[in-house]
Amino acid sequence: MVSTTKSTGSVTQIIGPVLDIAFPNGQLPKVFNALKVQSSEGTITCEVQQLLGDNKVRAVSMSSTEGLQRGVEVIDTGSPISVPVGTDTLGRIFNVLGEPVDNLGPVDSESTLPIHRPAPAFTKLETKPNIFETGIKVVDLLAPYRRGGKIGLFGGAGVGKTVLIMELINNIAKAHGGVSVFGGVGERTREGNDLYMEMKESKVIDADNLKESKVALVYGQMNEPPGARMRVGLTALTMAEYFRDINKQDVLLFIDNIFRFVQAGSEVSALLGRMPSAVGYQPTLATEMGALQERITSTTEGSITSIQAVYVPADDLTDPVPATTFAHLDATTVLSRNLAAKGIYPAVDPLDSTSTMLQPGIVGTEHYSTAQEVKSTLQRYKELQDIIAILGLDELSEEDRQTVSRARKIERFLSQPFFVAEVFTGSPGKYVSLEDAIKGFQMILKGNLDDLPEQAFYLVGDIDEAIQKADSMKD
């Protein structure tokens, strides 16, 4: 029950983004309540983290505390930070407090929800694992996503993370009638702006009719205080939960970057008086991660499928953040610079990407055996590459030459033209059903297409298109 009377306190101590605030006896705010601090720079929103005793609370600020003084008035709002939800959020950019930051005026949304909410009850969860078809061959065949699952997206700069994300947003809207929420957690402001502009250009955001857009954006960027970066993931998740629970839709939630979410928590952890744990991270790392991840799930009415970019500090997979994140992931999509250099897009590494869904009991024997055969062919090709580089292709046995030929066709057939890249490439995008993808790879593996040139398989949709392309190349 939210209290209607608002108690007033005053700031007694300021240490960076952390404030100590004294309240009158018996009028202490609850943990996670939002507080409004009246400063000369305007109103600052804080969130209560600890009750210290002696009628004092410790809170973390969601915006900069520059210019703040001791003694200024603080008002307890009586409830947690609440953000607008619903279709009015589509096509807009919000900050951690749910305030629009795109200069397109206020949001008309009548509904708001608090950012701290319990995970769905166990009885409401969808227990049968279902494949979430993306229409992207390499993903659906070799590392399929689970509906309501969590996927880690690993890749350096410039290998196509953003384009892959935009294609997934586009495909979920077209194939599943779903929407997406993008949470920019502690990443570069410039990249956030570029993403917004590219989304407008590729019509993922419809500037003329915002409600027809397919995505809502929530940003808490690198230049913002840790409080904002620590909570912006929850703001994005809350908006996604509304689409799942009330609109009963399939939702894609992107978190870029999950590492920054933990990093922000570690920045304020010591200021809150907690003893640091391994590598200087907060002792509550696993709890904070679990509270976020457990809300991302599939219920009997809708689903939130989450794709999380994972920054791996110093490429050390044993670092507490990647290690804790891995425990929650159902699949990993690894982008490879070598494939990007060859011009094979999406540059998803077929051998490094994994999925817990790739089991015969879930995907069926046909899908599983095709995927395993594709992987073993590519693995054999990888082993033979050193021999080819030194001795040449002619020194290989007949069988190995055939394997290399098929592997090169498979490698090219794993590429695909994207809808969102049409603007840049001029070739129309293709959505390939899982059934068509399996059929195509089986034909290559069986040797039915050995006589076709490998270039015919490059940047096509299904196998019929590759055959047509080969025919046109003959002409």
Swiss-Prot record:
GO biological process, one term: proton motive force-driven mitochondrial ATP synthesis
Record EC number: 7.1.2.2
Protein name, as recorded: ATP synthase subunit beta, chloroplastic
GO terms for cellular component: chloroplast thylakoid membrane; mitochondrion; proton-transporting ATP synthase complex
Physiological role: Produces ATP from ADP in the presence of a proton gradient across the membrane. The catalytic sites are hosted primarily by the beta subunits.
Reactions it catalyzes: ATP + H2O + 4 H(+)(in) = ADP + phosphate + 5 H(+)(out)
Its membrane topology: Peripheral membrane protein
Keywords annotated in UniProt: ATP synthesis, ATP-binding, CF(1), Chloroplast, Hydrogen ion transport, Ion transport, Membrane, Nucleotide-binding, Plastid, Thylakoid, Translocase, Transport
Organism: Pyropia yezoensis
Main location: plastid
Top EC class of this enzyme: translocase
Domain of life: Eukaryota
This protein's record includes keyword Signal: no
